[in-house]
Amino acid sequence: MSSNTTTPTPTSTPTPTSSPSIGPVPIPYESASFGNLLFFAISLVLCGVVVLIGMKQYISLKRTPIYATFFSFLGWFMCFSIAYLVPLDIIVTDHLQCVIENNETLTGECEIPVTYLPYGMITQQWRFLYFGSLILCWVIFPVLQSFSTAGDFRFWERVKRATKENVILYTFMFIAGLIGIIVILSVKEMDPSSFLSFVMLLANVYGVILITITMGYGLIDVPRNLLRKGSHYAILRNYRVEAVVLKTELEDVKRQLIDHLKLIKTISDRAGQYDPFRIYLDVIISKCPTEYDVLIQEYHAEPLPAGMEAEILSYKYLVGIHSTLLDLVDRNHSAEVLYERLLGKAFAIEDIIETRERNKQTAGNNQIAGEERSIQWSFKSTKSNGKFEYLWHMYIHPWYFIIAGLVCVCLSGIILWSEIVLALVSNPDYSPFYRAIVRMEPGIGLQIFCFIPMIYMCVCSYSTLFKLRISNYYRLVPQQSNTFSIMFSANYLCRLAAPLAYNFIQICHVNQDNSIVSPFSKIMGDMNAFGDNALGKRFTLFFPIFMIVVCVISFFNLHKRLAGSCCIRSLRIVTDTSEGAVDHGLKILKQEREERSLTGGVAPVKTRMSIVKEMFTKKKGAGILVTDNSQLDGASGAHREPSIDSSNRYKPTPTKTSINIPKLSRTYTSAAGNVYSSTQDGDENSNSGIKPINSFFSSILGEKGNASNNNNNNNNNNNNNNSNNKNSNNNNNSILTSNYESYSTPRTKDKQGLLSSALDKMDFSFQDDDDHTFDDIEMGAYGTGRKNKK
């Protein structure tokens, strides 16, 4: 394919083969030099840096679990690695074809490119990408996604539930696949090799369908969004429409969250303090947002109708409550973040437009125009280089996006033309990519030429996945995406990588006239497992036509109109872009501006460059409300959550009782709210404290008589009544210990005598190693039925 190669003779040129093997032409052995390895290492590092920057746009590295960050990084890395693997694949194939056609060695006239990597190394890279993606997509990501959404309270319970769900899913898939294989084998005979190729074909077909939809939509959407950003008025109109949608969504999810918190409060009230499932309820309550505590604490559920019993708590029921709570909290947080970001961007655009209109009015006065060459921001301070900021937003910014949009329009047109040639024309000379590759020398120039359209196709395909929202199931939120959405995106990015590379190699016609097969085709195959029939020959050419259909649908917004006419709300597509929706959005933004002006403003939106800068400088600030209007961007009113006692959340306020116990070593508050304090004011006060403590314990322990409570002054009688019990081996030192002597308490049914024998000493203290003593007494757990501690 090189221009400096000689024309091969018919006898020396082997017949092209569609087999994934190399064929009769042997590939010369190549060893990787130091320069090859250095270039390969640089490529890996650059790809990793790009992946980290891209992930930082959508996730918070502090909030996201380590396992999700690690495996998501692997998935993103594999999908972005095709941006440098595909150009290298084309260079290797072109160079080896030159060597074979000229019957030369690797050091002959076919000059080795600077960025050249050995054929075997590229093959191993494709093998790693293919089988690595296979394991991630079908084993690791499904289990981790189920694990992240499980509502169980124990680690191993979550692992068990995630594994069980995936085993059930794969069992049904295996049964369906087995039935399909039986049907296919009954229709067509296949040898083991053909059957394996057929299975790989089916796996690739799913990815090809995904890539036609995502890239077909992105080829139209990316240039359209760039051109739209070239007009401030078009951006503001779009923000007003989005304000209506996000405002409605935020109100809906808040209402659902409050209803669910009320349900949790009702369950907590009816369960009581000593329910066996109290520990799980406390875990659920600890994850409830604190900003709704005042509202929920005052809520009291209506009593159940007569004859109707409350639902019995179970572990499975609490798991469902927990899972729903986590989902609603995440959706509420995402809706708040998106709405706040929209307000920040909308207010900034309004300030820019106001500055533009003011400049038009003062255009005749050069002195005033020169003095006002800065943007008057409503909720952030003007930067030190205000003049450059003014020039950027007024002049550079619109033209930058217009030029970028026009360039993307040209790239989209070239790619679509190449897809049409691939589908409808047998002569590859009509493909601009094929003609360029034929005429260019294999080297850095060819690699750059292949890299630009390849990275653009990646942007078009992946941006569609980033913008996609599947009901409440999947959504990427800038720097606030949950664990499930991050792994879902990595899962499908892996699925898109191989089909995207295959499509680019197809439109470049790399294997058209070559006597060798590219490293990619050697690993992935050429998808001709259907045989030589009409379907098999044209199967790989069907998806370009389907991609063109998707582009037409996206260009005329037919999908939005269809969703609006069918009332498919689950698709979450903004269908109302009429003037009525724009006016409604204008009212919302105006109302929010007035309210935020009084309450402290809106945090400025973090740009992509500021996020990247934070990664290296570790400086925080943009996007955070500050208390001083002179700091950062001028937004004030930082919200500080009040300190709340988490132990009493969503619980009725207990009636506290103050009980005096003479010579107590410290003041003790039980879980039931009773306060036990010491009185050190003399014997009179000490003796006066015996009656309330005796009467309290008598009521707790169920003693019906009051005679023993009135005998506190007659200690000798109490001692005589208990003299036969002092020889017992059971010790009460786990509750009360004497400062002067240790004594034994009997394990008897006479609970009043047990307490009196301790109180008669009048000199005792609580042990610090058992803080639940009085809780047990209040519950009636002490005495019979409880083992004494040694």
From Swiss-Prot:
Family: Belongs to the LIMR family.
UniProt-annotated location(s): Membrane
Low complexity composition bias: residue spans: 1-21, 706-734
Biological processes annotated in GO: cell migration; chemotaxis; endocytosis; pseudopodium organization
TM region positions: 34-54, 66-86, 128-148, 167-187, 195-215, 401-421, 442-462, 539-559
Disordered: annotated span: 1-22, 630-665, 701-751, 765-790
Coiled coil: 236-266
A cellular component term, taken from the record's GO annotations: membrane
Keywords tagged on the record: Coiled coil, Membrane, Transmembrane, Transmembrane helix
Main subcellular localisation: membrane
Protein name: LMBR1 domain-containing protein 2 homolog B
Membrane topology (UniProt): Multi-pass membrane protein
Source organism of this protein record: Dictyostelium discoideum
Biased composition (Polar residues): 644-665, 735-746
Residue spans of biased composition, Acidic residues class: 766-778
Domain of life: Eukaryota
